[in-house]
């Protein structure tokens, strides 16, 4: 699971984020000797409706990861945060969403 903030990002970093995320996932899968290792990306919620370009670019890349990298699911935390804090008030709800994403990946892999 990758659960990383975006508060210190720039638009330039957003342009390379997806490529770096692909590389990171690939390296972890190689190191763990499992090319199909399920990987969950958790998007941090919007902080006070923050909408700067760097933040949005990272969130966009995180959403694309699900379609561009095999065995990856993206989970958003927007619906479990208050928008006054990037940390969810209901951590259990986010944990359940993450678990569902993981099981969706592992069930799909088992069907192949």
Predicted regions, residues:
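Cell-envelope and extracellular/periplasmic
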Residues: 1-112
């Amino acid at each position: 699971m990758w659960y990383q903030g975006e508060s210190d990002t720039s638009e330039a970093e957003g342009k390379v984020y997806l490529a770096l995320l692909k590389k990171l996932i690939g390296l972890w899968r190689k190191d763990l000797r499992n090319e199909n290792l399920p990987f969950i990306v958790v998007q941090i919620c919007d902080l006070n409706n923050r909408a700067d370009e760097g933040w949005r670019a990272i969130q966009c890349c995180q959403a694309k990861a699900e379609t561009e990298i095999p065995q990856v699911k993206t989970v958003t935390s927007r619906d479990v945060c208050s928008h006054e804090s990037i940390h969810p008030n209901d951590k259990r709800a986010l944990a359940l969403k993450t678990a569902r994403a993981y099981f969706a990946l592992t069930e799909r892999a088992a069907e192949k």
